[in-house]
Design a protein with these regions (language model features):
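Acidic, gly/ser/pro-rich intrinsically disordered tails
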Residues: 1-5, 10, 16-26, 39-45, ...
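OB-fold and OB-like beta-barrel modules that bind single-stranded nucleic acids
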Residues: 7-15, 32, 68-79, 97
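Short, acidic/hydrophobic/Gly-rich beta-strand patch recurrent on exposed beta strands
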Residues: 29-34, 51-53, 94-96
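Short regulatory "switch" loops immediately downstream of catalytic or recognition motifs
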Residues: 35-38, 82
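Short histidine-centered catalytic/ligand-binding loop motif
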Residues: 44-54
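Beta-rich strand-turn-strand
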Residues: 55-90
Length: 121
């Protein structure tokens, strides 16, 4: 049965992925910068920064492929979690990536910045 909890996004890796390994268990976190489909009042592009994570074989593959400033397509599920930090209850919403596709390998940050026009995505 197909789940209705699914997302798809195309964006730019905006910081190097952080890989963790504990007892043969792999985990990676990264952030994807995506362009909104409208401009700010100053006619500048607006962005969202999606916090993503992946586990296991997907994490290992992402570690090998993802570098800062490459353009990727990702898909997976949205999940929320609750945790305590300094005795304060906090919530986080994260994207659990189960599939990914590098789209354009870039050599310079400017290539990712060229995806700033809302009409391009």
């Amino acid at each position: 049965m197909s789940s209705i909890n699914q997302f798809q996004a195309i964006g730019c890796i905006n910081r190097p992925p952080q890989h963790y390994e504990k007892e043969d268990s792999h985990f990676i976190t990264f952030s994807v910068k995506v362009t909104r489909n409208y401009l700010s009042r100053n006619q500048r592009p607006m962005y969202d920064f999606l916090n993503c994570k992946a586990y296991g074989e997907v994490a290992i593959q992402i570690k090998e492929v993802f570098k800062e400033d490459i353009i990727v397509a990702i898909s997976g599920q949205i999940q929320t979690r609750r945790f305590f930090h300094n005795d304060e209850k906090r919530y986080a919403t994260e994207l659990l990536v189960t599939q990914f596709y590098p789209l354009i390998p870039t050599q310079m940050r400017s290539t990712c910045e060229n995806l700033t026009s809302p009409t391009q995505i």
